[in-house]
Amino acid sequence: MTDAEEPFWRAKRLEQMTRAEWESLCDGCAKCCLVKLEDEDTGELEYTDIACRLLDAETCRCSDYANRSERVPDCVTLTPKNLEDIDWMPPSCAYRLLKEGKDLPWWHPLVSGEYEAVRLAGMSVHGRFLFEDEADMEDLEGRIVSWPLMPPE
């Protein structure tokens, strides 16, 4: 890429991206893999610190990405078409940021060139969650956390 060329995430709309470009937008924060609670009356969404059983604790990536939808029926496959209808992506999510016309933050791997920057910036779930099978799923309200809703710096 020359200095005059814009990176693909600035030059293309989400629906124009190739599959590889689309997938590379995921920074690996894994906040979308946390169990979320929705208030039935207000629609307000709250994140817990309980993660999907398929989340790899070290990499913060899905341990069975190709088969995740079959193994976890609630898992959502994000696409440019359904992104508009998904309102629970965290404020730091690249898909959400770009949809809102914002740029990627400094710690995003496509900007920083370092996958670890997400973790070092404190934007990852790494070291801050329990797996579903380790948590008391009857006490989800006791596991509500606010850190996944931190906006990008």
Swiss-Prot record:
It comes from the Bacteria. InterPro entries: Puta_zinc/iron-chelating_dom (IPR005358), UCP006173 (IPR008228). It holds the Pfam family CxxCxxCC. PANTHER family: UPF0260 PROTEIN YCGN (PTHR37421:SF1). HAMAP family: UPF0260 (MF_00676). Belongs to the UPF0260 family. This is UPF0260 protein Plav_0898.
